[in-house]
Each structure stands twice: as structure tokens, then as C-alpha cells.
Amino acid sequence: MKNFFRKFFKTVAFLACLLVLFYLVSCIFAFKQDDGIMNMDHFYDLPKDTVDVLLLGSSHIGVNVDPSILWNQRGIAAYNCWGRMQQPWNTYYYLKECLKYQTPKLIVLDVYGMTFSGDYPSYDSLVQGTQGLRFSKDKIENILVSAPEEYRSALLLGLPASHYRYNEITKEDFQNFFWNKDTKIQSVEISGNPVQSFDIMDISGITQSEPLAEKCEIYFRKILDLCKEKDIPMLLLTSPYYLHEQEQRRFNRIGEIAEEYGYPFLNFNENYHELGLDTHKDYCDLSHMNMAGIEKYTSYLADYFVSHYQLPDRRLDDNHIWNRVVE
């Protein structure tokens, strides 16, 4: 009997060591892109009831809207759970995940991703659209709906999808364990002062709508239904950029769906001059603003948020985590 228990405890100890080793190696080799992955990793570090405004979508919101400006100007506690080329189904599952940990007073979705076509994005987008979530039923569903069959097992296991990073490992990869917390306010940084000059087409004459891709509309409606179910106000918008006629027709369709659900939709391609934006000075490429444009756009949104929604000024709350971090 003693031999049995000795073998049993040795086996348990061995398996426990294997699990710990697997965890440590997984953390070191895990993908660590800022968008879609590390922003979610830091989201999990936030105390409950930290986030009043949840920002979702592609780089059109991730690069163009700076949460630190929202905080500094209006005391808006906003968090950006964006991902590059974030697909509508990824947005849906990221929203579901976020609502497990925070109860925002407003959800803001940049709907550029709703104009996408195709069922599967690039592999990089697959990684950034799935690997930021903690392992759960929702993460499994997200991977199954996002990835073609040949990529699913690697994405589900995590480590096989990222093991090739061995030649990219830096000291920062050893600061990604559960005891490493990052609760600071998000901010956008554009290095240098890049400028891309272009003109946004006059879309006033584009009045017809075009159907969204079937899969995109299904998950767009799932997002809207979830917000209705949770009784959380939602604002749909699209930041101004160098768009094409087909995209505007799809934005018209998005406007129709938004009206169906009773949610406002701000298409800033129609009135970007009201934001004070100059497309010959305030952009670093055809879709993303430089720091001058980011400040103008985010400042406009800050004023809009507080004038249309009941959002507290968290700078007055000494117990809020971002007051403690700032201090």
C-alpha cells in the first residue's frame, strides 16, 4: 500500500511539473502582438467595473482613437479591444469575453470590418482574432468559426501555433506570466510625423445599399442582439478614410440595419470636415491618422460621448485604478 501511494504521489508530482513547464513555455512563446492579443491580456488585469466605454473593431478604431485622450480630456474610462483586420465574428466573441469581466455603460463599434468579404482572413489575422482570449467555450467557438480546418488544432492548442518564435524571444517574453500585471491607461503612439495626403470622395450621391457578406451580417446582428440582450447602449461609427464606392454602399446597408435595431450610426466619411480633419495633413496612410488627426478625432468623440451618454468623470474617483496608476 505504501508503494502504491508513493507511486501515485510521484505520478501526480510529475504531471504537475509537466503542467507548470507547459504553462511557462506557453507564456514565453505565446504571440504578443499589441492588437488582439496583448490588449486582451492587459484587459484581464483590470479590476471589475474599470471600463465604462468599450471600443471594438479593426485598426480604424485601434489606431485612430486614443483612450488616454478620452481620459485626460473628459475622464472617460475607455478600453480598446481592437485587432488588425478584426473580423465580425472575432468582434462578437471578444465582446462576449469582455462582458464576462466588465459592465460598460457604452459599447462603441467601428463597423469597417462589417464591409469585409470572405469567410477566412490571413493567418496573421487568425492569430490576432483568436489568441487573445482565455481558454473557454467561447474561444473554441471563435477558432472554429474563424479558421479553416488545417489551422484549427494549432490555434486551439496555442503552443504549436507559436513555437516557431524561438528565434524572436526577447526579455519581454519573460514578463508575460500571471503575476505580471499591466493596468495602465492605453495610449496610441505613432513614431515620427508621417503624412499621407489624399482626398475622400464625395459620397453624397451614393444612396444605394449593397448587401453585406452573409457571414458578416450574421455576426453583425449577433453583436447587436447581444447588446440588446444586455441592455447596453451602443454607438456604431466609421472613421473617415480613403474608401471605395462599394464600401459606402455597404455602409448604407449598415445604416439600415442600425436603424432597424434603434442604434445610431455615425459615418464620418460624410462630414469629416466637422471634425477639423485635414486629409492632406492629419493621416499617416490612407486609413490611419497621425498624432494630429488622432487628437482631433478622439477629442470630437470625447465631447460626443459625454453629451449623448451618461458617463461619469472617473478622474474624480480616487479609487479608480487609472487614478492610482497616473499618480
Residue ranges and their predicted role:
Residues 252-325:
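C-terminal regions of proteins
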Residues 106-118, 177-274:
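Conserved, well-ordered alpha-helix/loop/beta-strand core segments that scaffold catalytic motifs
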Residues 56, 60-146:
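Membrane-embedded segments
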Residues 124-230, 315-327:
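Secreted/periplasmic serine-hydrolase-like ester/acetyl group-modifying domain
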Residues 78-84, 208, 212, 286:
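Acidic/histidine-rich helix-loop elements
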Residues 29-50:
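Alpha-helical transmembrane signal-anchor/signal-peptide segments
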Residues 6-27:
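Hydrophobic membrane-insertion alpha-helices, especially the h-region
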